[in-house]
Amino acid sequence: GFKTVAKLSTQTFSRLFPKKSNWIVELNNWEEVKPKVEQNFKAHCYYFDVHCSKPPYYGIKDEGGELLAFARFTAVQWEIVRMPGKMGGFLTKTIPFIPFLNRIIRPKNHQFLVPDIVWSKNKDAQLLNELFEGVLALKNQHLILWWVDQQDSYYKAVQSKIKWGILHKMIGASPVDVVQKTQSTTTNEMKTPVFVSAIDMV
């Protein structure tokens, strides 16, 4: 049968007016980020680097050139037929007419960024906040959707320290089950977090 072996969070990061960061740099060399990616993600279940090894990446470097944070971002465009929940149909029709909120959610042309291989030195939440907001400003976007294992040590370290934005205040972080087909009748939970590649979620 099928077993739920892990749970992901659909974590939103939104800014109505994202602030530009002068510290954001574009990185085009997989070898520059590879050691940190493998150090932090290689032990994750389902880890593979077919997609995450393809630049560009966006990061933060200090004045000495040390890499302090980075992630890879995939630009996504969806059409939302119906929002979730009892009021979903109503919200889908009304959000385009609600000032400011319609910057973040545009049902007919819903654009956002999806990160993977998210990392910051010493699991620094302030660096991650700077990275996410700076990339939103750079890409002229207002929303990031980050799918990440709820048991991921990095996510657990930064979760309560990030200003996730107005959309998170409205809907929180939605859970997603990772389901695996198995012949065993026992629960087969993952012993390490699941590696989530952006391309698998969009």
List PLM regions with ranges.
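Amide-forming acyltransferase catalytic core, primarily the GNAT-like/NAT-type
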Residues: 1-111
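Acyl-donor binding region in acyl/amide transferases
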Residues: 84-165
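Acyl-donor-binding surface of acyltransferase catalytic domains
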Residues: 1-21, 131-136, 142-201
